[in-house]
Amino acid sequence: MGRSMDIYKPEGSLIDTPENREYLSSLASLEYAMNAGVVLEGRAALCDSSHALIVELGAYRGMIPREEAAYSIDGSEVRDIAVITRVGKPVCFKITGTVRGAEKPTFLLSRRAAQLECYEKKVSALRAGDILDAKITHIEPFGCFCDIGSGLIALLPVDCISVSRISHPKERFKAGDIIKCAVKSNDRQTGRITLTHKELLGTWEENAAHFCAGETAAGIIRSIEPYGIFVELAPNLAGLAEWCEGAVVGHCAAVYIKSILPEKMKVKL
């Protein structure tokens, strides 16, 4: 007991750690965690009719009331969908109290308190250029929503994923992926954080150094234009090939590298 945990990682990172399992192993350890204000994780087993989350705590159960299900910087009310979608997934929380029952106590939990601590001690201090782990929670055509700690969400726009153009983020990532990102902006008034990934993939020169003129390389067709076909050789490196019939965006292609022009940052294929 009392060992420190890196608790400000994306939600789900703590649940299988030895420390977390130890805290959930007995009534005494759960009470210790409550008194010490330790952030823990458990799996949300169900959402009841009042939209409270019931969480598995080893041999015990805990309840996160709807109003304690999430922290909002602007004070907006927790949406039903934000609670319901946590069912079956790990949730972070602090133990705030107990309700004594006939057989076992039920623990009162607050995910909001755990997220508030993460915001105050980590997220609010993030600055442009800071690098962090992010877990992709879901994907839309305009970008990826990412958990950057304790279920707090930031946006990775599609045009910040790579220099090479992609039509949809799913061409790079899927929900559940844990990736490295850099903070692009942090609006502390609205709580909106924007991430970028492409700067971590190396410069054009670093990517081009892996290829030489005269080589044949595998690439992915990213766009087809009247004047040629853009083929991605690496996430931050694409070249222009001559137009040919039968090319399909997203398909793999073998291309011959005609020339690499560092001064123009161009690759002719």
Feature map (PLM): residue ranges:
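Single-stranded RNA-binding regions, centering on S1/OB-family and related RNA-binding modules
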Residues: 1-269
